[in-house]
Swiss-Prot record:
Lineage of the species this protein comes from: Eukaryota, Fungi, Dikarya, Ascomycota, Saccharomycotina
Coiled coil: none
Effect the entry attributes to changing residue 102 to D: Impairs interaction with MYO2
Outcome following mutation: residue 206 to N: Abolishes interaction with MYO2
Gene name linked to the record: YPT11
Cross-referenced PANTHER family: RAS-RELATED PROTEIN RAB (PTHR47977)
Protein name: GTP-binding protein YPT11
Keyword GTP-binding: yes
Pfam families, A to Z: Ras
Any one GO molecular-function label of the UniProt entry: myosin V binding
Length: 417
């Protein structure tokens, strides 16, 4: 055997040249999260399922924060440089109402899980390209297999057999070319539709569906938990006991094109909520009224006067104050998002959330107004900062013989001058 030279895979380097090391650790800030997030390029709230990395309504002070780990805990660095893991505070939103009023679509729109027509068109074209590649690959395999079979049976084939095989191949090509074409079945109305309009394709909720979203309000994290309930009566008995426990906001949802769903909020859903709320949970709960499908305003059956009248009836009959009433459309971008942000800010300002940070005390807007009133009461009386300087009277050393001497009363001896 001939001897072969063996080569080493290790590269020889000079010991005087150290290997390059980074001078400082690489830090990732929110701008990098936004640039790396695919949601910021495809949306005007986010494409993430539950968490995102873009700013929501900077005027409201709410920002969606990217998840740093699976548990959802975030680290806050102190002045000493050490970081402590603090769980975000929980805010539970419960959406109740009749079936087909759009509760599921509202939650998916807030979590940005609904696609627009432009995004649907891009995904359909991508799907069509992939199917076209599979089709071309399938045709090549079919032609190769056909040629192999022809070589094996060429002495048995006639002209009629060749014509039949040729027709079968053309029929297969026509079927695969039509499959997955995004232009087939589209109407002219779809071509004239708004590309930014959201396409709603949801199904009826069975039981309960829960979505979570992490938001940042003034550098404090809140875990927003949205509970989607079924509107059918057959699912109510199983979910009522644990439905209203630790609920911070009850969102009464109705369809503006369906007057019956609006009346159900007064006759059924608000009564059910008051019967199942505990006295302790009711103190930290607020009620909101949200009308959906305002894009169908021409078919409106619920007017603004009806809404104001129902709010007054709820307060007189049940003693419940409606903290806000809104009208939204899940087909319009950012409408549901702004409404949910206003509800969340109202809950935070009034201390209606589960505080998981023991170092932070809950201060509501009522407490702030009370402190301001006490301050104004104390300031009503003006302070007198003028000080009068009093001079100490010095005792005169001279003696007036015409007046009695005070030292005699003190049993002190005196001498006549």
């Amino acid at each position: 055997m001939s001897q072969r030279k063996r080569y080493s895979l290790n590269v020889v380097t000079s010991p005087s040249i150290p290997s390059p090391t980074p001078s400082a650790p690489i830090r990732t800030n929110e701008s990098n999260w936004e640039a790396a997030s695919p949601a910021s390029a495809a949306s005007s709230f986010l494409p993430n399922v539950h968490h995102g990395g873009t700013v929501l309504n900077p005027g409201l002070g709410i920002m969606r924060s990217p998840s740093l780990n699976k548990s959802g805990a975030f680290g806050r660095s102190g002045s000493s440089g050490s970081s402590t893991v603090i769980e975000p505070s929980n805010i539970k939103l419960l959406l109740i109402g009749d079936a087909n009023v759009g509760k599921t679509a509202m939650i998916l729109s807030y979590c940005r899980e609904l696609l627009t027509r432009a995004e649907m068109s891009r995904s359909a074209r991508l799907r069509h390209q992939q199917q076209q590649q599979h089709k071309d690959l399938g045709l090549k395999k079919t032609v190769v297999n056909h040629r192999l079979s022809m070589k094996e049976k060429r002495k048995r084939y006639s002209s009629n057999d060749f014509e039949k095989e040729f027709k079968d191949i053309n029929h297969f090509a026509d079927e695969t070319s039509d499959f997955g074409n995004p232009n087939i079945g589209d109407d002219n109305n779809h071509e004239m539709a708004d590309p930014n309009e959201i396409v709603i394709e949801t199904r009826s909720t069975i039981g309960i569906d829960i979505k979570t979203n992490l938001v940042n309000i003034d550098n404090r994290f809140f875990n927003v938990i949205l509970w989607d309930t079924a509107g059918q009566e057959r699912y109510q008995n199983a979910i009522i006991p644990s439905l209203y426990k630790k609920t911070n906001a009850v969102i009464l949802t109705y369809d503006i094109t369906n007057a019956k769903s609006f009346q159900s909020c007064m006759e059924r859903w608000i009564v059910q909520a008051l019967e199942n709320f505990s006295s302790q949970d009711l103190l930290k709960a607020r009620f909101f009224l949200v009308g959906n499908k305002i894009d169908l305003y021409k078919e409106r059956q619920v007017t603004h006067y009806d809404v104001v009248q129902m709010v007054q009836e709820m307060q007189l009959k049940h003693g419940i104050k409606i903290s806000g009433n809104f009208e939204v459309s899940c087909k319009w971008v950012n409408v549901v998002e702004r409404t949910m942000n206003m509800i969340i800010l109202d809950l935070v300002e009034n201390g209606c959330f589960e505080n998981n940070d023991p170092c932070v005390s809950i201060t509501t807007s009522d407490d702030v107004q009370g402190h301001e009133q006490e301050f104004h009461d104390t300031v009503e009386e003006p302070f007198n900062f003028t000080r009068q300087r009093q001079h100490q009277l010095e005792k005169n050393n001279t003696v007036d013989i015409t007046k009695p001497n005070d030292d005699i009363a003190n049993n002190q001896s005196i001498c006549c001058v």
